Amino acid sequence: MSSAYKVAMSASASPLLMLDLEGLEVSATEKDMLAHPGAGGLILFTRNYANHEQLAELVRQVRAVRPDMLIAVDQEGGRVQRFRDGFVRLPPMAALGQRYDQSPTEAVREAALLGELMASELTELDIDISFAPVLDLDYGNSSVIGDRSFHGDADAMIALAGAFIDGMSAAGMAATGKHFPGHGHVVADSHLELPVDPRPLADLEAADMPPFMALAPNLAGIMPAPDITDAGHACCHGGLHPGNRILDHDCLIRTKPHFISGI
């Protein structure tokens, strides 16, 4: 686990903001924002990447302002891979699920290798974390999740995601499970509107939470789903009471960013 992640964990009792940058380098205004004590992390996007040399320089600029800044990216694989040119193109995790149905042992081995590969490419550039893996089950309902999910079966999910996490750990990267308590059943796109999962919370706990419960000891963070569940509980606005019980260990909680319109 990176030193920046340890610093973030030590400060996690107080809410911290995760910032983003407009372009390929850090502006003077952005340096001031990064230096603010309320800034706990930085998430990078495709707009922040041109090539390895530029990215390394961008990270250096950030570290010059805040050596302990947690630098993150969504580098799951498939359609959610922010850095592509010059990086290994990772498959969607559903490809591992399909492989699992044919050869579970080989699929689990490949999941570990992909997790280590993804993490090692980032840590070599001094990037602390990729927000991965997705632990949402694929019900065939959500186009937002879809092939980002390893599988629709909880046991297969636990096996594959657990191996992926092991691979990340081998490369020195902490894992973040998302989207707690499960985002695969909703249809609405949370980037555009607030999704509603009409199922009772008890059903959610029985069907969607087992991967989070099983893998909780290996997760350093969780990302809540921006859903309304159980007659009005908002998962990322105070409805995380199941998480207080299930994820009973030190854990960063990273909510969805402000620019998602559904929140």
Task: Name what the model sees in each region.
Residues 2-26:
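Boundary/entry segment of secreted carbohydrate-active catalytic domains
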Residues 38-157, 185-197, 225-231, 259-263:
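Enzymes and membrane/adaptor proteins characterized by extended Gly/Ser/Thr/Asp/Glu-rich
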Residues 8-10, 32-35, 62, 70:
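Short secondary-structure boundary/capping segments within folded domains
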Residues 22-35, 110-121, 207-212:
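Short, acidic/polar
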Residues 1-4, 256-258:
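N-terminal amphipathic/basic-hydrophobic helices that include classical n-h-c signal peptides
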Residues 19-20, 26, 47-67, 71, ...:
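Second-shell residues forming the walls of enzyme active-site clefts
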